[in-house]
Amino acid sequence: MGNSFRSDRVAVEIQREINDILRNKVRDPRVQDVNITDVQLTGDLSQATVYYSLLSNLASDNEKAATALKKATGLFKSELAKRMTIFKIPDLTFAKDESVEYGSKIDELLRGLNDKSEY
């Protein structure tokens, strides 16, 4: 049980640091609209899945951002090693956060229902 609390704290710290690294260290224009939304860690803190959202809905922008994030993984790990005081920095895997798009679609549907009820 204590391990879960620790992994949650480390995940929040990794999320904050990666967002900061994206804004201040990564100069790649393909990731300028990327925001880290969540980090999920394994119980032993060896693997981290980093979820990101993108302001653009274009598939080409998504592919470019995914490629750029994968390419910058080494930079993220080295910067995290400098900034964090944990024994081993977890291996990072990036995944697009689909919940943002899903929420937007639900919002759109609700607005559509609201518009129809006004007639």
UniProtKB/Swiss-Prot annotation:
GO terms for biological process: maturation of SSU-rRNA. Keywords: Cytoplasm, Ribosome biogenesis. It is found in: Cytoplasm. Gene3D superfamilies: 3.30.300.20. The keyword Metal-binding does not apply. InterPro entries: KH_dom-like_a/b (IPR015946), RbfA (IPR000238), RbfA_dom_sf (IPR023799), Ribosome-bd_factorA_CS (IPR020053). The keyword Oxidoreductase does not apply. One of its GO terms (cellular component) is cytosol. PROSITE patterns: RBFA. One of its GO terms (molecular function) is ribosomal small subunit binding. Its main location: cytoplasm. One of several proteins that assist in the late maturation steps of the functional core of the 30S ribosomal subunit. Associates with free 30S ribosomal subunits (but not with 30S subunits that are part of 70S ribosomes or polysomes). Required for efficient processing of 16S rRNA. May interact with the 5'-terminal helix region of 16S rRNA. Belongs to the RbfA family. Monomer. Binds 30S ribosomal subunits, but not 50S ribosomal subunits or 70S ribosomes. PANTHER family: RIBOSOME-BINDING FACTOR A, CHLOROPLASTIC-RELATED. This is Ribosome-binding factor A. It comes from Lactococcus lactis subsp. cremoris (strain MG1363). The lineage of its organism: Bacteria, Bacillati, Bacillota, Bacilli, Lactobacillales. The gene is rbfA.
